[in-house]
Amino acid sequence: IKPVYVLDELFQAKLIIEAVIEDLKIKQELFCRLESVLEADSILSTNTSSLDLNKIGTNLKRPERFLGMHFFNPVPVMALVEIIHTAETDPSVTEFVFQLAKKWGKVPVHVRNSPGFIVNRAARPFYLEALRILTDGATDAATCDAIFRDCGGFRMGPFELMDLIGLDVNYEVTTQVWESFDRHPRFEPS
């Protein structure tokens, strides 16, 4: 791994893991630019938290070499990485990235491209109910976190985790999942 300061310097990279802002247009533009400078056998991956990979990769010339690698914060500590494939992702690309993640000491899981993937889809009600508990005045954020952490065995409570992730990112992910499920009330941002 080495830093570069101009995209053209990536021309020999075999694997790109993109981690820019959760903005579909920005990701689409970046991947098109990357594809234009990379060799044909390079693998493009996105660390998106919830954006539809089919939409991100819609303009790619080589969609079979595109997939998701969703890491969790803090990345050096958290072992899980979701390996997300689309209908167009070459299975050998998916398997290569899966095995590479294992070599890095991660615990990869195969995931089909779907709203929020596994963790962010399952986590939405966790965060949303915590926010509703706070809004309803049932308890304060610190007490809620302490209950989950000290009594429930969680490493962090819901508010601590939202703070680590960033409220802006958490809200955007919740909105994307909610929109993907036709604004189903169980995913409605609060």
Feature roles, as predicted:
Residues 1-190:
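N-terminal glycine-rich phosphate-binding loop for ADP-containing cofactors
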